[in-house]
Amino acid sequence: MIAAELAACFPNKIKSLSLISSLGLWIESSPVTDFFILTADERKQLLWHNGESEIAIKKSTVPEDPSERALINVNRTITLAAIGKFCWPIPDKGLKKRIHRINMPTLLLWGDDDKIVPSDYGQLFNDLITHSKLIIIPECGHIPQLEKPQEFLSAINDFIGAI
């Protein structure tokens, strides 16, 4: 979302753009999941195509050590506060009015099973950005760079190689 905003505001300063499962637009019939009201288990099930996969379990396991657990909670609180400042109550801060300014090659990467920001948003970004390419990664949720790293890196490398 922030990258798209910067690209729309400063298109002459940006050579290329990659948006991964990005917020920034709003589709009334396909709302973005309110990430802030989710329990830890709901978050695990919604972030990943398979909430029981090795990466999902690794990323959602809470450490036994109280100091480590406290540090994770502090980091999560800071992260959610920062995200909340930019993304809510509605993750549409007017980008749709500026998106026509994004004129650089743009890669849009989405998981086909993104339950946080559905792939409908990838299609909308693709429709609104002139020089964009949408890649939807199969059997993948909201975090393709972690859930499908090979496919993610292949898409990024192909994109960079083509510009």
PLM regions and their residue ranges:
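Short alpha-helical segment within the catalytic ATP-binding CA
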Residues: M1-I2, I143
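Short, hydrophobic alpha-helix immediately C-terminal to the catalytic nucleophile
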Residues: A4-A8, Q123, L153
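Flexible "cap/lid" loop of the alpha/beta hydrolase fold
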Residues: A4-C9, K15-Q45
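Conserved alpha/beta-hydrolase catalytic His-Asp/Glu region
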Residues: L19, E28-S30, Q45-M104
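Glycosyltransferase donor-binding loop in the core domain
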Residues: C87, D114, G141-P144
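Short alpha-helix in the alpha/beta-hydrolase fold that links the catalytic acid
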Residues: L95, M104, P118-N126
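Short beta-strand/loop motif that positions the catalytic acidic residue
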Residues: I102, L108-W110, D114
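Catalytic active-site module of serine/aspartate enzymes centered on a nucleophile-bearing elbow/loop
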Residues: H131-I163
